[in-house]
Amino acid sequence: MSRTVFCARLQKDAEGLDFQLYPGDLGKRIFDNVSKEAWGQWQSKQTMLINEKKLNMMDPEHRKLLETEMVNFLFEGKDVVIDGYTPPSE
């Protein structure tokens, strides 16, 4: 049976994550307040950030930058801005 959460990103009730995907208190906050849909959106943005900014996940500063962007995206409603990227027009 799926869980329902009030998603902080989407501002609506939606299907929650199946398990905690991120460690610590932030992971618990994500599990309790972020939907599968919003997490999927974040994963796409995260991939773009890692590739475009050439982030190395072995570097603690790069991991901290990615975590900050994640919190901004999931909880503060800020979109990820990547210099030089123009989203495709619909």
Curated annotation (Swiss-Prot):
Gene Ontology CC annotation, any one: cytosol
SUPFAM superfamilies: YggX-like
InterPro entries to which the protein is assigned, alphabetical: Fe_traffick_prot_YggX, Fe_traffick_prot_YggX_sf
MF annotations from Gene Ontology: iron ion binding
One GO term of the biological process aspect: cellular response to oxidative stress
Alphabetical keyword list: Iron
Pfam families: Iron_traffic (PF04362)
NCBIfam families reported for this sequence: PRK05408.1
Function recorded in the entry: Could be a mediator in iron transactions between iron acquisition and iron-requiring processes, such as synthesis and/or repair of Fe-S clusters in biosynthetic enzymes.
PANTHER family: FE(2+)-TRAFFICKING PROTEIN-RELATED
Similarity annotation: Belongs to the Fe(2+)-trafficking protein family.
Protein name as it appears in the record: Probable Fe(2+)-trafficking protein
